[in-house]
């Protein structure tokens, strides 16, 4: 169970880092929002899901 929690936290940190860099780049590019809207929504949905997963796993571990 601890390994699953650690992997979920790592995935959350990695996704956060990717979104931290990717979102401003998409908004700064001329046609970025129109062409990458679905990718950003998917990344944001993944991030929200990982936040809930980490919370659930944390409550099971402690």
From Swiss-Prot:
A Gene Ontology biological process term: photosynthesis
Domain of life, source organism: Eukaryota
Chief localisation class: plastid
Cellular compartments annotated: Plastid, Chloroplast thylakoid membrane
GO cellular component: chloroplast thylakoid membrane; photosystem II reaction center
One Pfam short name: Ycf9
Ranges that cross the membrane: 8-28, 41-61
Topology versus the membrane: Multi-pass membrane protein
Coiled coil start-end: none
UniProt KW keywords: Chloroplast, Membrane, Photosynthesis, Photosystem II, Plastid, Reaction center, Thylakoid, Transmembrane, Transmembrane helix
UniProt xrefs under SUPFAM superfamilies: PsbZ-like
Subunit: PSII is composed of 1 copy each of membrane proteins PsbA, PsbB, PsbC, PsbD, PsbE, PsbF, PsbH, PsbI, PsbJ, PsbK, PsbL, PsbM, PsbT, PsbY, PsbZ, Psb30/Ycf12, at least 3 peripheral proteins of the oxygen-evolving complex and a large number of cofactors. It forms dimeric complexes.
Biological role: May control the interaction of photosystem II (PSII) cores with the light-harvesting antenna, regulates electron flow through the 2 photosystem reaction centers. PSII is a light-driven water plastoquinone oxidoreductase, using light energy to abstract electrons from H(2)O, generating a proton gradient subsequently used for ATP formation.
NCBIfam families: PS_II_psbZ (TIGR03043)
Family the entry assigns: Belongs to the PsbZ family.
Name by which UniProt lists this protein: Photosystem II reaction center protein Z
Organism in which the protein naturally occurs: Daucus carota
